[in-house]
Amino acid sequence: HERSSAASDVYKRQGNEIFIIYSNDPRKVNYKQFGIKKATLIDNTGAWTDEEGLNQHIKNPSVERAILTAPAKGKIKNIVYGINDERLKGDEKIVGAASCTTNAITPPLKLIDEAFKIQSGHIETIHAYTNDQNLVDNYHKSDRRGRGAALNLVITDTGAAKAVSDVIPELKGKLTANAIRVPIPNVSLAIMNLNLKKSVGVEELNDLFKQAAFHSNLRTIIDYSNSIDGVSSDFYSNEFACVYDAQATISNFNCVTIYVWYDNEYGYSRQVV
């Protein structure tokens, strides 16, 4: 997240040249002229989410594999780094990296489920608006997203609950999810209301996440915040998949509510890489 300028179709960053290539057909892009071969291509267009569409990249002789930055459909594996990447055998041509929200909520859900067993739950994401929404009221196939994104709180759906169950099969059918798009450009918040098998206190939950953030194999994925005045802008450019907000945790016997922040751009990009 920083300003840059590009006078041509080459963007220079930290001594590297990044070429800006224009094409309407991924099969016909001439990557060879840029010295690109056996490439891993990251598709974040959102144009294709299934094997048929994404195979267009693979048919290009310079592309060896493709990673989708959205929940993949069909038989494509959805992978959240640090959670289920052991499923990768190394011979996959196409892999789905799920979504920014799925990458943010899956690590905390796995952590809590392993410790206390999740019986059911609902996840509400307070999500920065995206380029899928209209800036002024206009037609959109998803009606509410057609309303002005910079002026409204917009209730919309999210596939995060289903995507979580793809990554953690034990949670299949136990979670629901929804989203509220809000008029900020970046950093989102997931609120998880969970019913557990046993009663758990706030201190016990905070200890669980503190240990995970500092002393477990999730320490590069889950961050821990104990700030009493933390707000969304504090987590701009945070490199973790999610940041557990210890001050916001609520417990009512076996019903708990946890809050996790996430930079839905930079934090997710780190997960993809």
PLM segments and residue spans:
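Single conserved hydrophobic/aromatic residue that forms the stacking wall/gate
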Residues: 1-7, 11
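Short glycine-/small-residue-rich Rossmann-like dinucleotide-binding loops
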Residues: 24-25, 45-46, 71, 99
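Hydrophobic alpha-helical hairpins/lids featuring a short glycine-rich hinge
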Residues: 29-58
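Rossmann-fold NAD(P)-binding glycine/threonine-rich loop
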Residues: 47-92
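Rossmann-fold dehydrogenase core element
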Residues: 81-100, 117-124
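Active-site-lining helix/loop region of Rossmann-like oxidoreductase modules
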Residues: 90, 107-215, 219-220
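Short alpha-helices
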Residues: 95-109, 113
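C-terminal active-site/capping subdomain that shapes the small-molecule cofactor and substrate pocket
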Residues: 177, 189-273
